């Protein structure tokens, strides 16, 4: 089962904006040595929206090869076109990914019947597990719990959700409708602790790009019922969780990674580099977490 801290991986670029393959592979290796529980390439944080399909596939292949089955690879495979989502999911399966993360279609705003058709079509096209990515703030639609339940009950390879609704009560609602084996992962670092307390089993995390050890320790503390330690770790991470989203993501987390010497901070337009004031806040948050010496 997918659980724990799963990093929503950034995609390092060189100063010209091309994929930095060496930096990416080194970054993935560092994540594993730090104790991360899984990695998720080419999602929102990986700037999938500004990657070509060829680049998207390239990153998945690099990630699968570097990970070499040591932790699960949950590959992004979303699109607002069902046929494109199927193509990306099939490629991820062929490349050796352990699961795919499929976002609810954005911009075209399908109704619940359209959402069911979209995900059922993908489920029929691949055999690997599918995680529904429900993020109304970006896709402008919210998959109803009943739609999620129907998909889960009717397709064996639809196994759970990355919930980025920031509505903590959804964990209980989804658990009640879908059952205890439905995999619920938080999509928001700020709610990760409470999410687990309500029945979640982990977080697909942005902050773990720079704090994989702390995020994995927080998740482990939750699993062992040690919420005192989990709260202490959460308090260390919370300023960072907030700071990296002051300006449009992933500029914030890429700056933080660059500050720690993990990769460059280049982002692709229309995302732009951070202002100096936000950089200062992130520096302070990194120091608060114990990741950056004052």
Swiss-Prot record:
<dbReference type="InterPro" id="IPR013785">
    <property type="entry name" value="Aldolase_TIM"/>
</dbReference>
<keyword id="KW-0457">Lysine biosynthesis</keyword>
<protein>
    <recommendedName>
        <fullName>4-hydroxy-tetrahydrodipicolinate synthase</fullName>
        <ecNumber>4.3.3.7</ecNumber>
    </recommendedName>
</protein>
<dbReference type="InterPro" id="IPR005263">
    <property type="entry name" value="DapA"/>
</dbReference>
<comment type="similarity">
    <text>Belongs to the DapA family.</text>
</comment>
<feature type="active site" description="Proton donor/acceptor">
    <location>
        <position position="133"/>
    </location>
</feature>
<dbReference type="InterPro" id="IPR020625">
    <property type="entry name" value="Schiff_base-form_aldolases_AS"/>
</dbReference>
<feature type="binding site">
    <location>
        <position position="45"/>
    </location>
    <ligand>
        <name>pyruvate</name>
    </ligand>
</feature>
<dbReference type="GO" id="GO:0005829">
    <property type="term" value="C:cytosol"/>
</dbReference>
<dbReference type="InterPro" id="IPR002220">
    <property type="entry name" value="DapA-like"/>
</dbReference>
<dbReference type="GO" id="GO:0019877">
    <property type="term" value="P:diaminopimelate biosynthetic process"/>
</dbReference>
<keyword id="KW-0456">Lyase</keyword>
<comment type="function">
    <text>Catalyzes the condensation of (S)-aspartate-beta-semialdehyde [(S)-ASA] and pyruvate to 4-hydroxy-tetrahydrodipicolinate (HTPA).</text>
</comment>
<dbReference type="GO" id="GO:0008840">
    <property type="term" value="F:4-hydroxy-tetrahydrodipicolinate synthase activity"/>
</dbReference>
<dbReference type="Pfam" id="PF00701">
    <property type="entry name" value="DHDPS"/>
</dbReference>
<comment type="pathway">
    <text>Amino-acid biosynthesis; L-lysine biosynthesis via DAP pathway; (S)-tetrahydrodipicolinate from L-aspartate: step 3/4.</text>
</comment>
<keyword id="KW-0220">Diaminopimelate biosynthesis</keyword>
<feature type="site" description="Part of a proton relay during catalysis">
    <location>
        <position position="107"/>
    </location>
</feature>
<feature type="binding site">
    <location>
        <position position="204"/>
    </location>
    <ligand>
        <name>pyruvate</name>
    </ligand>
</feature>
<dbReference type="GO" id="GO:0009089">
    <property type="term" value="P:lysine biosynthetic process via diaminopimelate"/>
</dbReference>
<feature type="site" description="Part of a proton relay during catalysis">
    <location>
        <position position="44"/>
    </location>
</feature>
<keyword id="KW-0963">Cytoplasm</keyword>
<keyword id="KW-0028">Amino-acid biosynthesis</keyword>
<keyword id="KW-0704">Schiff base</keyword>
<comment type="subunit">
    <text>Homotetramer; dimer of dimers.</text>
</comment>
<feature type="active site" description="Schiff-base intermediate with substrate">
    <location>
        <position position="162"/>
    </location>
</feature>
């Amino acid at each position: 089962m997918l659980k724990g801290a799963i990093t929503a991986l950034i995609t390092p670029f060189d100063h010209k904006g091309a994929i930095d393959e060496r930096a990416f592979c080194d970054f993935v290796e560092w994540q594993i040595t730090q104790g991360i529980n899984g990695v998720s390439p080419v999602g929102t944080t990986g700037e999938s929206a500004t990657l070509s399909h060829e680049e998207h596939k390239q990153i998945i292949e690099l990630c699968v090869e570097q990970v070499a089955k040591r932790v699960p690879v949950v590959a992004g495979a979303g699109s607002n076109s069902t046929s494109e989502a199927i193509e990306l999911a099939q490629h991820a399966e062929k490349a050796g990914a352990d699961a795919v993360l499929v976002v609810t279609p954005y911009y075209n705003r399908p109704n619940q019947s359209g959402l069911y058709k979209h995900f059922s079509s993908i489920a029929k096209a691949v055999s690997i597990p599918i995680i529904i990515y429900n993020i109304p703030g970006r896709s402008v639609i919210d998959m109803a719990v009943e739609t999620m339940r129907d998909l889960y009950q009717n397709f064996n390879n639809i196994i759970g959700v990355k919930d980025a609704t920031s509505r903590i009560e959804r964990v209980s609602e989804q658990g009640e409708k879908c059952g205890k084996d439905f995999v619920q992962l938080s999509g928001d670092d700020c709610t990760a602790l409470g999410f687990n307390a309500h029945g979640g089993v982990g977080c697909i995390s942005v902050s773990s790009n720079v704090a994989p050890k702390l995020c994995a320790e927080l998740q482990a503390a939750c699993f062992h019922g040690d919420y005192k330690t989990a709260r202490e770790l959460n308090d260390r991470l919370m300023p960072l969780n907030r700071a990296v989203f002051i300006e449009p993501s992933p500029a914030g987390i890429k700056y933080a990674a660059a500050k720690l010497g993990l990769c460059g901070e280049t982002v692709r337009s229309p995302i732009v580099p951070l202002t100096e004031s936000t950089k200062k806040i992130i520096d302070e948050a990194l120091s608060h977490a114990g990741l950056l010496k004052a």
